[in-house]
A protein has these predicted regions:
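Short, well-structured hydrophobic secondary-structure segments
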Residues: 63, 71-81, 89-90
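Structural detector for internal amphipathic alpha-helices that build alpha-solenoid repeat scaffolds
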Residues: 35, 43-55, 76-86, 107-119, ...
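Alpha-helical transmembrane segments with an aromatic anchor "belt"
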Residues: 81, 96-103
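Exposed alpha-helical structural elements
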Residues: 10, 28, 47-51, 62-63, ...
Length: 218
C-alpha cells in the first residue's frame, strides 16, 4: 500500500488534484463519504457534481491505479470517479478490493461503481461479497451499500440476485439481528438516488451516454 508522504510525490500530486480539492470548505472525499453530497442544497450539490464529473473525465487510468493503491480516502474517491465515468474495465479490480475489505469506507465507492455499471457481472461481485460478509456479524463493513447496489441492478435488469439474501430469516435478517436490530428492516434503496445524480450528469453531457432501463429503447 502506498501512503501519502514526501517520498512519493507522484501519489501526493494525484491526491492534491483529485481527492482533496475543497468544496464548501472540505475535501472532495468527505462529500463522497456516505454520499454526503446528496444531503446538500442543490445550489451546493450542482457545482460539486459538475467538478466531480470533470475530474472523472480528466483523470487517467494510471492515476486511478495510483489512488487504488493508497489509503481509504484515495480509494473511495477513485471508485467514485470510475463509477461516474463508467470505466467498466476496472470492474474486476473493484470487485476484488470490495471482497478483500482491507480499509474502512472505501467499499462504499466500490459498491457505487458496480451499481453504476449495472450488469450481471457486477451483481456477481456484490453477491459474493454479501455471501461472505453477511455471515460475519463481527464485520459491519459495507453490507448495506452492497445490498442497495444489488437491488439497483436487479431493478434495472429484471434479475433477482438479491432475493436469496432477503427471504424471511435469511442472511440479511440474521445479520441485522446480530447487529442488535430486533426487527430487521428492508434494505434502503439509497444508491438509486446516488446513481441518479450521475445518470443526470451523463444525460446532460450526452443523452446517449445515460444508462437505459431494461427494456427501454435507446
Amino acid at each position: 500500500m502506498r501512503f501519502p508522504s514526501a517520498s512519493d510525490p507522484g501519489l501526493l500530486n494525484v491526491i492534491d488534484r483529485y481527492v482533496t480539492p475543497a468544496a464548501q470548505g472540505v475535501g472532495r472525499y468527505l462529500h463522497l463519504l456516505h454520499g454526503n453530497f446528496a444531503r446538500d442544497d442543490e445550489s451546493e450539490r450542482t457545482p460539486f457534481l459538475q467538478a466531480l464529473s470533470t475530474a472523472a473525465r480528466e483523470i487517467t487510468d494510471d492515476e486511478l491505479e495510483i489512488l487504488l493503491e493508497s489509503e481509504w480516502r484515495s480509494r473511495l474517491t477513485a471508485a467514485w470517479l470510475i463509477g461516474f465515468d463508467l470505466r467498466e474495465h476496472f470492474r474486476d479490480v473493484l470487485g476484488d478490493l470490495l471482497l478483500a475489505s482491507q480499509l474502512c469506507f472505501a467499499g462504499q465507492g466500490y459498491c457505487f461503481a458496480l451499481a453504476r455499471f449495472g450488469t450481471d457481472e457486477d451483481a456477481q461481485h456484490l453477491a459474493v461479497y454479501l455471501d461472505r460478509y453477511l455471515r460475519r456479524p463481527d464485520c459491519p463493513y459495507d453490507q448495506r451499500w452492497a445490498i442497495s447496489a444489488l437491488l439497483r441492478i436487479d431493478s434495472r435488469t429484471g434479475s433477482e440476485h438479491a432475493a436469496r439474501f432477503l427471504h424471511p430469516g435469511g442472511l440479511w435478517d440474521q445479520w441485522n439481528e446480530a447487529q442488535g436490530r430486533r426487527r430487521p428492516s428492508p434494505p434502503s434503496r439509497f444508491i438509486d438516488e446516488l446513481c441518479a445524480h450521475a445518470d443526470e450528469d451523463a444525460a446532460t453531457r450526452d443523452p446517449r451516454s445515460a444508462p437505459q432501463d431494461a427494456g427501454t429503447a435507446p
